[in-house]
Amino acid sequence: AEAAQLPSLLADAEYAVINSNYAINAGLNPVKDSLLIEGSASAYANILAVKEGTENTDAVKALKAALESQQVVDYINEKYDGSVVSVVTNPTDGYDASVNYDALNGTTISVAASPTPHAEILNVAKEVLAEQGIDLEVVEFSDYVQPNLVTENGEVDANYFQHTPYLDSFNEENGTHLVSVGAVHYEPFGIYGNGVTDLKDLAKGATIIIPADDSNETRALFLLQQEGLIKLPDDADAAKGVSTLDIVDDGGYN
């Protein structure tokens, strides 16, 4: 199923593997409501992405510095309480000494983003940039296609909504030329169920729905294998991707 639809489908499908971003939007608490929440998954950290060739512009570097500020890191860790986690290991004051901030004073940097948590996080970075006289315009999108297209065609300076495996897949399928300039946070996947509070009580024959896009389908299947619910081939490679067709033992689940 489409990743954004998973929370609404949960009532009919018994169980679902849901990204914490969508769980939060649906009123679920990933830490309290999930049967299991994924551990640190650095390969799936959400990134700031730009069009290739703009990585070293002052605007992009200033934006990256703001997102790596202590102010933003503290906001993420306090606001989301483990359901969204900062991956910035050395927070700064939000200032990049290599940037000509005088030249950026009075300018606007535009970023395409998902509403939650990306736009919320960017609004904190907006405060950091404002201290240097820079305005940050956050353009919200509810889908996972338009943010990359408007970044590719130059309508916005950057986007913040996806992880690297999704970006790589999107570039390959659409001929776009987008690159990551840094990881900001990750959103752990969780396994959710109706009326079940312990993973060991997950019933045989139950239906488990997972995201349909290639990168997140792979991620969900490896999580299910990690918990012993399914078995993938011994040579299964997350970097190359897997699908439900690759499952060698479904554990009695659908």
Question: What residue spans do the PLM features occupy?
Answer:
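Periplasmic-binding protein-like
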Residues: A59, L67-V88, N216-Q225
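Ligand-binding "clamshell"
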Residues: N25-I37, S169-V181, V196
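A C-terminal functional module that forms or caps the active site or interfaces directly
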Residues: D12, A16, S20-G53
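Beta->alpha turn/N-cap motifs
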Residues: E2, A11-E14, I18-I24, P115-T116, ...
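Short helix-initiation/N-cap motifs at beta->coil->alpha
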Residues: A1-L6, V138-L149, A236-N254
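A bilobed periplasmic-binding-protein/Venus flytrap-type ligand-binding module shared by bacterial periplasmic
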Residues: Y44-A62, P188-K200
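Short, well-ordered beta-strand elements
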Residues: L104-T116, I134-E140, T207-I208
